[in-house]
Amino acid sequence: IQSTSMDQGILTEDSMNSFIRTLIQAGIWKNKVPKQTARTKDGMQTTVKKTEAEADAMASKDTRLGFQPVVSVDAELLRQQRRFSSPRVLLSENTPLEPPPLYLTEEPMVLNRTSRRKREGKSHRGEYSVCDSESRWVTDKSSAVDIRGHQVTVLGEIRMGSS
């Protein structure tokens, strides 16, 4: 399982408890369903399954004593427990077809971008800002200088469609 973002959400205590209960119910916790031996009135021994509360108490006792349970988890069970807070996270069992986008290297000829880069961090390839030195929209200009220093014409209106 691979993640393409470091923006994974933190699991809450309730979701972790739910996950552990699922493991216990599936018989995966310690690779068996916990059982205990009980005596009936006639002295015969019977095997009785522990309740969920008793299993949780035993697990917490084992943790306090330093025992780490061996857990083998099926991939399908983990697939059901994915909980991330960001839609930008993509999990896949396959390797990505291409590497992640590269960061632009610092270019010495780029003007007026030093303070902006410090504020916003490095920009990704193909991501350009419309206006670097002003923090408001400019609507009355017919020409401008782009980030590479070239003179460009600013379109007052963009027509879309077949007109």
UniProtKB/Swiss-Prot annotation:
GO terms for cellular component: axon; dendrite; extracellular space; synaptic vesicle. Transmembrane segments: none annotated. Residues 1-3 form the signal peptide. Glycans are attached at N112. It comes from the Eukaryota. Belongs to the NGF-beta family. Seems to promote the survival of visceral and proprioceptive sensory neurons. This is Neurotrophin-3. It comes from Lichanura trivirgata (Rosy boa).
